[in-house]
Amino acid sequence: MATIGALLLRFFFIAVLMSSQKSWAIKEEHTIIQAEFYLLPDKRGEYMFDFDGDEIFHVDIEKSETIWRLEEFAKFASFEAQGALANIAVDKANLDVMKKRSNNTPDANVAPEVTVLSRSPVNLGEPNILVCFIDKFSPPVVNVTWLRNGQPVTEGVSETVFLPRDDHLFRKFHYLTFLPSTDDFYDCEVDHWGLEEPLRKHWEFEEKTLLPETKENVVCALGLFVGLVGIVVGIILIMKGIKKRNVVERRQGAL
């Protein structure tokens, strides 16, 4: 899906160094990232804060609302969404200028890597969550579709915003709540400007192969037998060593 697009991306890094009060030696290093972008031809932007790789909050541009990743965060801090909207407006204006100066050269497309896994160990009949992890891609635009038995699923789905990486690429998580069953299989289909065709990752329940009881007994018996043989051989070698030493001592005494 090769689509020409333009992207203005700004990263601001704030390093927070935590030091020990006793030794004044630096023990840990944390990073807060303010990431914002405006994208064409989608005509959309994003504004978010990240702490050590985890989202703190982002601003819903359409609703002019600050969305905290965890509700508890809002009890300790606040952020006015209007500030983010002002930044996005500046990004849009700057992008228009940069497009003209660069002769409308589009940003390079980097195709994503996609992984599908369950959030927790899967047990039949127990609710769980499938995670579609989309990583190492640019620009920040993807279309994601969950499929169950080949059919699109729209209920029980959620997603994160685009999360920045240290290498200026992006990552994103999509989630699907599901009830594990041997009759169902799932796919996460990802479309991106860097892909020639949508990339689909498959997941289905796989029963754990348990070792039959008879084989377990054979393995245990074999292990016990090998252990006993080792003990017997060890005792024989020790006894031979003692006898050999006694013979040598007697000969030396006779001399």
UniProtKB/Swiss-Prot annotation:
Which residue spans belong to the Cytoplasmic compartment?
239-255
Q: Where are the transmembrane segments?
A: 218-238
Q: What does UniProt give as GO cellular component?
A: external side of plasma membrane; lysosome; MHC class II protein complex; plasma membrane
* PROSITE patterns on file: IG_LIKE, IG_MHC
* Positions of region (Connecting peptide): 204-216
Q: What is its main location?
A: membrane
A single Pfam family, by name? MHC_II_alpha
Extracellular-side stretches of the chain, per the record, are: 26-217
Q: Which InterPro entries match?
A: Ig-like_dom, Ig-like_dom_sf, Ig-like_fold, Ig/MHC_CS, Ig_C1-set, MHC/Immunoglobulin, MHC_I/II-like_Ag-recog, MHC_II_a/b_N
Disulfide linkages recorded for this protein, renumbered to the chain, are: 132-188
What residue spans carry the region label Alpha-2? Answer: 110-203
Domain Ig-like C1-type: residue ranges: 112-204
Share an example GO biological-process annotation for this protein: antigen processing and presentation of exogenous peptide antigen via MHC class II
Task: Please list which residues make up the signal peptide.
Answer: 1-25
Task: Provide the protein's localization.
Answer: Membrane
Sites where a glycan is attached:
143
Renumbered residue ranges of the record's region Alpha-1: 26-109
Bilayer disposition of the protein: Single-pass type I membrane protein
Keywords (alphabetical) are: Adaptive immunity, Disulfide bond, Glycoprotein, Immunity, Immunoglobulin domain, Membrane, MHC II, Signal, Transmembrane, Transmembrane helix
Q: Which family does it belong to?
A: Belongs to the MHC class II family.
- Show the PANTHER family listed in the entry: HLA CLASS II HISTOCOMPATIBILITY ANTIGEN, DR ALPHA CHAIN, MHC CLASS II-RELATED
**What name appears for this protein in its UniProt entry?**
H-2 class II histocompatibility antigen, E-U alpha chain
